[in-house]
From Swiss-Prot:
Positions that bind ATP: K639
Protein location: Cytoplasm
InterPro entries: aa-tRNA-synth_I_CS (IPR001412), aa-tRNA-synth_Ia (IPR002300), Leu-tRNA-ligase (IPR002302), Leu_tRNA-synth_edit (IPR025709), M/V/L/I-tRNA-synth_anticd-bd (IPR013155), Rossmann-like_a/b/a_fold (IPR014729), tRNAsynth_Ia_anticodon-bd (IPR009080), Val/Leu/Ile-tRNA-synth_edit (IPR009008)
GO biological-process terms attached to the record: leucyl-tRNA aminoacylation
Name of the protein described by the UniProt record: Leucine--tRNA ligase
Organism the protein comes from: Cupriavidus metallidurans (strain ATCC 43123 / DSM 2839 / NBRC 102507 / CH34)
Gene: leuS
Motif segment ('KMSKS' region): 636-640
Family, similarity comment: Belongs to the class-I aminoacyl-tRNA synthetase family.
UniProt cross-references to SUPFAM superfamilies, sorted A to Z: Anticodon-binding domain of a subclass of class I aminoacyl-tRNA synthetases, Nucleotidylyl transferase, ValRS/IleRS/LeuRS editing domain
């Protein structure tokens, strides 16, 4: 046994051992030593994008998963911990543009490197189940299910709005539009309507909302999904009109439809606003050049709802009027840049008096503001918006004719009934959630399995011809989709008529790839999308990932699961029973700012920090030139702030176990973790202490085999088993930081137990190693082997979890605080089962009491059981 802890050697030996015995390969219906089938547990981290290297967020996420998997395996569970790669997506195309390499080559190189990094972390991954979403054997099932959805009407085609770069002749993702311009060309971006494919996620809106209640997810995530789904009860109604198009027919059958949750304010409508693409806007623009120019300006704006909420609200009158459905008054129609054609009917009613956005719009364009809701004791003014203007809980209708005096619900009911009687409206539930547009005008993604034929139209690719394979040797140049320029891919034969045809060149949203990968892990070699093995493992018991995926990924995966269920592919409603969202990893930031305001960020490793007398940062200088840098505070590790820590460098210097120990000890899994170089050093020191104890006591521990602890070990055993009880509780709560604290207490107890027998040391260190093992498996494995535990039991991989010996927790003696005349003077040791009389006698006879009594007998002795004795003289 080495006298010094050498992480590299210890970790290499452990990993070679695990590889040799295929330690992490898992099978369904595994049985335990007793011959009984083990209960399954599926614990999975969200699969990473193969960006090139692991970052500390990855290390934290996967270590949490690994600790859980190893702990549960030792507790007799059949645990699945797989891994794969979310391999399609725009970063690979960007890398191809920058480096002139095919996205496929870049992606596969990154996968190989990151897999090697994961293996160096000692993760208990069953690599036989590895999945890469860019593999044709994987994405063929994306295509297969898409075609099934198309058959059932869940997938459909309609026009959608995209960002178009007129110079590069390509569609841009929202994040590629910077201040209204293309990120590469700098050209002003246009909005364009193009045919796209959508999935009817809105058909599942109520189920997606209702099923959240039964999930073991953080409340914060549930609320985020609830808000995104956004159930609204309101009234959809029409403003009639006589506006005719060039064909002489009424536009939209003479009705401008809107939806509102505030039908009680309908009598306060002073304008309507429509989207730039609305038929009324198009009609008005034909004879109004200024309006046509404004509409064109609107088309250059963002197509993101979030941007709509924050941008400046602009409008222009169309000159058109519609009729108020209840009063018969004429209402002006405006075009508003804040109205989206893709939301509802592409039109909204304007009630400036009781809607903050409409209020600001009306003030800007000098539109009428008509108060129709009053709250007792409040005075209305158009000088500034006040919160009570939008109050529906306390407001009553005024200036509303027959509805005056009605509260919110009564007014909505009455107004909805009157609109229905006129055939102009009805109560309706609407959703903020929109159908999922899955078409992407990009190369590196799942090809949409459709063929365009001049004779037959759009024709699905026959199932026997799946997968439609993506060519992997194309290098994007930034000018359009390379699939549209590759005749090998583009040109095909129509499966219906046999004539020459063209493949669809759009690819699928990469969120589709992550909708079901965790199911493919269960049966990666299946000849169908999933098989019976998926029924065994799913639903997943524990999902682990970042809060940034709280909405889209998790929502889409839930939807995809429900579609698979309805097609008879799975037997469960929800994919993820429990969810843990780990906190971000934070680090210090440092920068310099030039005269133009541009910041240059310095990595913390390249900075010297000066501290004051209290140890707080007082200043910082760059190591390169000794000149000051600004301390920017603690922020999430990121490339943009250059404050990341390279996990590989950390592992190379300290070993994987030190990295794992630090990220588990520094904070509870769900909370933010602040990076600390001194904390890493502390973790390394602790592991050296563990090794040193094993080395120093190696002979005693070996000699203790086959013998029982003695009475001299009672105090040590009591401490070990007391701490074990707490550690077990913390493991079950996924509070791994306090588990590490428990192991530190155990080591302290072992080091302090100078008189412990070989058996006592052997048992105590055995407990410590097993409690430590899920967190730092390499050193625990090495010491387990070196000290002979494996010969006596089994490999620590499958060693039984230590059981708390309740008898060891019972104390034969207890220590009481000893007071004389109410002041603490010392302590008193008495038998644990001593009665009051025995305690009083022991106290009266103690040397401490004798010293203060000076021969006088105690007047009274007060005993507080289990705590103290007070001798009154």
């Amino acid at each position: 046994m080495q006298d010094k802890y050498l992480p590299s050697a210890v970790e290499q030996a452990a990993q070679q051992h695990w590889k040799a015995i295929d330690a992490y390969k898992v099978s369904e219906h595994a049985v335990g030593p007793d011959g009984k089938e083990k209960s399954k547990f599926y614990a999975c981290s969200m699969l990473p994008y193969p960006s090139g290297k692991l970052h500390m967020g990855h290390v934290r996420n996967y270590t949490i998963n690994d600790v859980m998997a190893r702990y549960l395996r030792m507790n007799g569970r059949n645990v699945l911990m797989p891994m794969g790669w979310d391999a399609f997506g725009m970063p690979a195309e960007n890398a191809a543009l920058n480096n002139g390499v095919a996205p496929a080559a870049w992606t596969y190189d990154n996968i190989a490197y990151m897999k090697k990094q994961m293996q160096s972390m000692g993760l208990a991954i069953d690599w036989s189940r590895e999945v890469a979403t860019c593999s044709p054997e994987y994405y063929r099932w994306n295509q297969w299910l898409f075609l099934k959805m198309l058959e059932k009407g869940i997938a459909y085609r309609k026009t959608g709005t995209v960002n178009w770069d007129p110079v590069d002749q390509t569609v841009l993702a929202n994040e590629q539009v910077i201040d209204g311009r293309g990120w590469r060309s700098g050209a002003v971006v246009e909005k364009r309507e193009i045919p796209m494919y959508y999935l009817r996620i809105t058909d599942y809106a109520q189920e997606l909302l209702g099923d959240l209640e039964g999930l073991g997810w953080p409340e914060r995530v549930k609320i985020m999904q609830q808000n995104w789904i956004g159930r609204s009860e309101g009234v959809r109604f029409a403003f009639p009109h006589e506006i005719k198009g060039a064909d002489g027919k009424l536009i939209n059958d003479g009705k401008l439809y809107v939806f509102t949750t505030r039908a009680d304010t309908i009598m306060g409508v002073t304008f309507c606003a429509v989207a730039a693409e609305h038929p009324l806007a198009t009609h008005a623009a034909e004879s109004n050049p200024a309006l046509a120019a404004f509409i064109e300006e609107c088309k250059h704006g963002s197509v993101m709802e979030a941007d709509m909420a924050t941008m400046e609200k602009k409008g222009m009158p169309t000159g058109l009027k519609v009729t108020h459905p209840l009063t018969g008054e004429q209402v002006d129609v405006w075009v508003g840049n804040y109205v989206l054609m893709t939301y509802g009917d592409g039109a909204v009613m304007g009630v400036p008096a009781h809607d903050e956005r409409d209020f600001a719009f009306a003030l800007k364009y000098n539109l009428p503001i008509k108060q129709v809701i009053d709250v007792k004791g409040q005075a209305y003014s158009t000088d500034a918006w006040l919160e009570w203007y939008g109050d529906k809980e306390h407001g009553l209708c005024i200036h509303s004719g027959k509805y005056d005096g009605l509260g919110y619900k009564a007014a909505v009911d009455a107004i909805a009934a009157d609109l229905a009687a006129k055939g102009l409206g009805e109560k309706k539930v609407t959703w903020r959630l929109r159908d999922w547009g899955i078409s992407r005008q990009r190369y590196w993604g799942t090809p949409i399995p459709l063929i365009h034929c001049d004779s037959c139209g759009v024709v699905p690719v026959p199932e026997k011809d799946l997968p439609v394979v993506l060519p992997e040797d194309l290098v994007p140049d930034g000018t359009g989709n390379p699939l549209a320029k590759d005749p090998r891919f583009l040109e095909c034969t129509c499966p219906s008529c046999g004539k020459p045809a063209r493949r669809e060149t759009d690819t699928m949203d990469t969120f589709i790839d992550s909708c079901w990968y965790y199911m493919r892990y269960t049966c990666p070699d299946a000849g169908t999308m999933v098989d019976a093995r998926n029924d065994y493992w799913m639903p997943m018991d524990q999902y682990i990932g970042g809060i940034e995926h709280a909405i889209l990924h998790l929502l889409y995966a839930r939807f995809w699961t429900k579609v698979m269920r309805d097609m008879g592919l799975v037997k469960f409603d929800e994919p993820f029973t429990n969810l843990l969202t780990q906190g971000m990893v934070l680090n210090e930031t440092f920068y310099r700012e030039d005269a133009s305001g541009k910041k240059t960020w310095y990595n913390p490793a390249d900075v010297d920090v000066q501290t004051d007398e209290r140890g707080r940062p007082a200043g910082a200088t760059a190591k390169a030139d000794g000149q000051p840098v600004v301390i920017g505070g603690i922020e999430k590790m990121s490339k943009s702030k250059n404050n990341g820590i390279d996990p590989q460098a950390l592992i190379d210097q300290y070993g994987a176990d030190t990295a794992r120990l630090f990220v588990m000890f520094a904070a509870p899994p769900e909370q933010q973790l602040e990076w600390s170089g001194s904390g890493v050093e502390g973790a390394s020191r602790f592991l050296r202490r563990v090794w040193n104890y094993g080395y120093a006591n190696a002979q005693a521990i070996r000699d203790g085999a086959g013998t029982a602890p003695t009475a001299d070990d009672a105090a040590l055993r009591r401490e070990i088993h007391t701490v074990l009880k707490q550690a077990n509780y913390d493991y079950e709560r996924i509070q791994y930081n306090t588990v590490v604290s428990a192991t530190m207490k155990m080591l302290n107890a072992l080091e302090d137990a100078k008189t412990a027998s070989p058996a006592g040391r052997r048992e105590g260190f055995s407990v410590l190693l097993r409690v430590l093992y899920p967190v730092v498996p390499h050193i625990a494995h090495g010491l387990w082997q070196e000290l002979g535990y494996a010969a006596e039991t089994v490999d620590i991989l499958d060693a039984a979890w230590p059981q708390v010996d309740e008898a060891a927790l019972v104390r034969s003696e207890i220590e009481l605080v000893l007071q004389v005349n109410g002041k603490v003077r010392g302590s008193l040791t008495v038998p644990a089962d001593a009665d009051r009389a025995a305690i009083e006698a022991t106290a009266a006879a103690s040397e401490i009491v004798a010293k203060f009594a000076a021969g006088a007998a105690p007047k009274k002795i007060v005993v507080v059981p289990g705590r103290l004795v007070n001798v009154v003289l």
